[in-house]
């Protein structure tokens, strides 16, 4: 068996419906990038603009509802051309790193479509604290620095380094962090690019046997998709579209229903739980499970899924 995936940068919803219709033979799914532009200016990605969660929800919901019963979504936060999601959309500090990585995984893996996990994402690998343009290997980053700093003087060197550390593709292209040995266990020789200095804290060896690790949380999410048809085939409906902190949606398949709640902020946020879920149970959670009740306080970067 084979599947066909079309990398369709700039594709419209109507075009995607034509390319990946379930009753046609062109593609099995489209890989579109509209949600990757939420934290960029219209004509410039080199910025430290933060994501507006309301806009992110609107874009992802457009694709969830627009392809429903017609075509199939690819679900992703990361790839080789994007920075690390835990640094980009959440909080990669030691305090919130693990819950942030698990929250992002919950949000995307509970949607309709096929999730893609980019190498290192399942560990919560982070952006890299580059300090010099000489440390970069990505031509897009190197050329942008030359043009915008040295030739056109649009940004100072300090400004551009800040933007590169946030958005450069090299953030996702450092060696995979296997263990805490030299070069993160990737090689016995010096790699082509620096290893992220946090490799002793974030690596596969440390996480594989830890039941509470980001890695094993991903395993749980993937197992649930194989066990529960509602995660694969259920319809998606957005709740709280105007919330600047909470991404909440439901999945429905027949009489089954799931509620997905994700806090994209470091604030504690009070949320009203829909009545039909108040006597439900947890499917998965990235914090110790609290009592399910009408009003719940959602902790920083908390995520959970309730079954009706």
Residue spans for each PLM region:
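Active-site and adjacent substrate-binding regions of carbohydrate-active enzymes
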Residues: 1-281, 285-308
């Amino acid at each position: 068996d084979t599947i066909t995936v079309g990398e369709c940068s700039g594709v419209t919803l109507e075009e995607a419906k034509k390319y990946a219709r379930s009753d046609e033979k062109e593609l099995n799914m489209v890989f579109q990038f509209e949600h990757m532009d939420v934290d960029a200016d219209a004509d410039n990605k080199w910025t430290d603009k933060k994501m507006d969660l309301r806009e992110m929800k609107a874009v992802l919901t457009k694709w969830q509802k627009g392809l429903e019963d017609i075509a199939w979504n690819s679900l992703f936060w990361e790839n080789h051309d994007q920075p690390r999601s835990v640094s980009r959309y959440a909080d990669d500090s030691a305090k919130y790193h693990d819950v942030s990585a698990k929250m992002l995984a919950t949000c995307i893996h509970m949607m309709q479509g096929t999730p893609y996990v980019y190498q290192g994402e399942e560990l919560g690998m982070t952006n890299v604290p580059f300090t010099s343009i000489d440390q970069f290997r990505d031509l897009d980053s190197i050329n942008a620095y030359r043009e915008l700093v040295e030739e056109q003087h649009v940004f100072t060197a300090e400004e551009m380094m800040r933007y590169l550390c946030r958005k450069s593709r090299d953030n996702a292209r450092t060696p995979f962090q296997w263990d805490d040995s030299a070069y993160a266990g990737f090689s016995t020789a010096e790699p082509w690019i620096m290893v992220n200095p946090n490799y002793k804290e974030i690596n596969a060896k440390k996480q594989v046997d830890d039941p509470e690790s980001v890695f094993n949380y991903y395993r749980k999410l993937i197992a649930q998709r194989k066990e529960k048809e509602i995660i694969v085939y259920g319809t998606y409906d957005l709740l709280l579209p105007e919330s600047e902190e909470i991404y909440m949606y439901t999945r429905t398949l027949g009489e089954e229903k799931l509620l997905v709640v994700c806090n994209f902020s470091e604030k504690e946020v009070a949320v009203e739980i829909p009545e039909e879920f108040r006597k439900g149970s947890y499917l998965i959670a990235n914090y110790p499970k609290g009592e399910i009740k009408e009003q719940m306080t959602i902790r920083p970067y908390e995520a959970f899924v309730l079954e009706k």
